[in-house]
UniProtKB/Swiss-Prot annotation:
Location(s) in or outside the cell: Secreted
Chief location category: secreted
Signal peptide: 1-19
Annotated tissue distribution: Expressed by the venom gland.
Keywords from the UniProt entry: Disulfide bond, Secreted, Signal
Protein name: Venom protein 54.1
The keyword Disulfide bond belongs to this UniProt entry's keyword annotation: yes
Amino acid sequence: MNFQVFSLIFFNFVYYCSCSTFEEALCELEKEERVKVLRCYEENTDPGILLYSKSFLSCLLDERASFITLNEMACGKTFSTNERRACFEEANVFLVNFTEEMKKKHKNAVKKCFDK
């Protein structure tokens, strides 16, 4: 695995699964506001990111549910080393196709949905 792919895996793992700025910001919101922000994100980003994040969170949470439900469940959840390792492997498949355009849409969606 090259460094760039590893960095992307690490970034996305931190983003979705640990105490990252985005997760902390989401989890600090009231539930109604959090759902509103996540719906905004869904409307303003690439569907590929949502499919990946749903799959990635589903892997960690062992739950097949909506993007919003999975993010709700992820707030406050601690993941074991084995869970993280398994999801690193799953993430690798997606990240090969994580294009610059998708990264830009993701960044813009986060900015638009939080900066209100």
